[in-house]
Amino acid sequence: SLTVTSFFSMPVTRFVADQLYEERAERVLPSFAGACAVQLALGCGGYGAFLLASGATFCQGLLCLWLFAELVVCWTAMSYLTALKEYRGILIAFAAAVGAAFGAGWMLVFWLGVPVVEGFLAATALGYGVMLGLDVRLLCRFFPEREGSPWRFLRWVKRYRTLALTGLLLDLGLFAHLVIVWLGPLGVQVKGLFYGAPYYDVPALLAFLSILTTTA
């Protein structure tokens, strides 16, 4: 999801900054809907094809796709909110999402007896759903007026292609090492096309979570 949104993140941030400078804030929220639509179409198509060949069960595939779609919208919303310097709102949404995910995970797995993989996937998706809802609520509060084409931001993507490529290459640089480790001696096949490296993934995940609210 971060790879998909990384291509659009910097041009979108520039678009928001330009519209605010020109005092055309009513154009911002429509562009958020357009950016989400484009990224969801591209991302869900590609990730859906991966899931079909991945060996995941139907339920696991649906949960993964649901989580992926939520993440795309969350990362996009964070790009808009960081352009507004609304860091406090992002932090509150992140904390609420963590609490909801842990609570739902405990309830689903340890109380209701849902299988571990499906239960924790659903809990994570629920947590990010909370973050998504709070982020979108913040955006609607900042930009109550809506006017203009939802596709206007694409002009900025075309105009600032170097920014788009910079974002994409930055993301690949940040996460390519994970694929290298998964395919190396530490890597294990979890299921089908899903690979991991527990000795590396756990500290890498904790390090990522510690800077998550600053990555937009």
Which residues fall in each region the model found?
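Membrane-water interface segments that mark the loop-to-transmembrane alpha-helix transition
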Residues: 8-48
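Alpha-helical transmembrane segments of multi-pass membrane proteins
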Residues: 36-40, 49-81, 91
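Residue-level hotspots within the lipid-embedded alpha helices of multi-pass solute transporters
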Residues: 2-6, 64-72, 94-98, 125, ...
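Membrane-helix boundary and inter-helical linker elements of multi-pass secondary transporters
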Residues: 21, 83-84, 110-114
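Hydrophobic/aromatic residues in alpha-helical transmembrane segments
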Residues: 8, 12, 77, 104, ...
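Hydrophobic alpha-helical transmembrane segments
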Residues: 93-140
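Transmembrane helical elements of multi-pass membrane transporters/channels
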Residues: 123-144, 150-216
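Alpha-helical transmembrane segments and their helix-entry boundary regions
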Residues: 27-28, 86-93, 120
